[in-house]
C-alpha cells in the first residue's frame, strides 16, 4: 500500500472556549470602554497608513495583562492551549510568553491588510463578536508554484476561517494573513496575540 507523507507541514489549531458565554459580556464591556476613549484610533506608526489598517481601533499591545477576572480566565485558557499546541509540533515547553496582545474593533468596510508577525513561532486570534458577518481571517499558503489546475483540488492557495465567537485559532506567526473588509453592519471584535515558548 502506498504511503502518504506530508514533509511540508503548516499547523493550524482551533478550539472553542467552553466558558465563553460566561465572560463574553465582560470582555466586550472592557474592550468597548477602551475603544470609546479614542474610537477607531490605530496605535503605533504604520508607514503604509490606510493601505495596512482602516476603520478599526487597535489597542495597545498589553491587553491580556489587564488584571480583571474575565481577562485572567481567558489568558490562562489561551496560555494552556498555546503550551499544548507547541508540544504538538514537538516544541516541549511548560511555559509560554505572551509577548504582546491587543484587540481590534472594526466597523463596516474596516480591514487589516496582509502582514505577518516576526519572531513569533505561534500567534493566535480569539473571536469575540462577529458583527453579523461570518468572514474571519485569510491566510496565504506558503507553498507556491502550482503548475496545473488540478493541484487546487487538494492544496488551496488560501484559507479563510469562519468567524465563530468563542473560537481560538493558533497558527505560525510567519504566515502572511489578513482580516478582509468587514461586511457586517455591527462592530467586529477580536483579540490577537504573539507568543514564544520558554525552553
Annotate each language-model stretch with its function.
Residues 1-91, 111:
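Non-heme Fe(II)/2-oxoglutarate
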Residues 4, 178-180:
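Karyopherin-beta/Importin-beta family HEAT-repeat alpha-solenoid scaffold
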Residues 95-96, 183-185:
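A short beta-turn/loop motif at secondary-structure boundaries
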Amino acid at each position: 500500500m502506498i504511503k502518504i507523507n506530508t514533509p511540508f507541514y503548516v499547523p493550524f489549531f482551533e478550539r472553542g472556549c467552553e466558558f465563553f458565554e460566561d465572560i463574553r459580556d465582560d470582555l466586550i464591556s472592557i474592550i468597548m470602554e477602551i475603544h470609546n476613549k479614542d474610537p477607531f484610533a490605530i496605535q503605533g506608526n504604520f508607514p503604509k497608513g490606510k493601505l495596512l489598517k482602516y476603520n478599526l481601533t487597535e489597542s495597545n499591545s498589553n491587553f491580556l495583562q489587564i488584571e480583571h477576572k474575565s481577562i485572567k480566565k481567558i489568558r490562562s485558557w489561551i496560555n494552556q492551549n498555546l503550551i499544548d499546541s507547541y508540544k504538538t509540533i514537538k516544541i516541549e515547553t511548560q511555559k509560554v510568553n505572551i509577548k504582546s496582545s491587543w484587540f481590534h474593533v472594526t466597523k463596516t468596510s474596516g480591514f487589516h491588510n496582509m502582514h505577518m508577525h516576526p519572531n513569533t513561532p505561534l500567534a493566535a486570534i480569539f473571536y469575540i463578536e462577529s458583527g453579523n458577518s461570518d468572514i474571519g481571517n485569510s491566510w496565504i499558503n506558503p507553498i507556491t508554484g502550482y503548475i496545473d489546475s488540478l493541484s487546487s483540488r487538494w492544496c488551496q492557495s488560501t484559507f479563510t476561517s469562519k468567524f465563530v465567537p468563542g473560537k481560538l485559532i493558533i497558527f505560525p506567526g510567519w504566515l502572511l494573513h489578513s482580516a478582509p473588509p468587514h461586511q457586517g453592519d455591527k462592530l467586529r471584535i477580536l483579540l490577537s496575540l504573539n507568543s514564544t515558548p520558554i525552553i
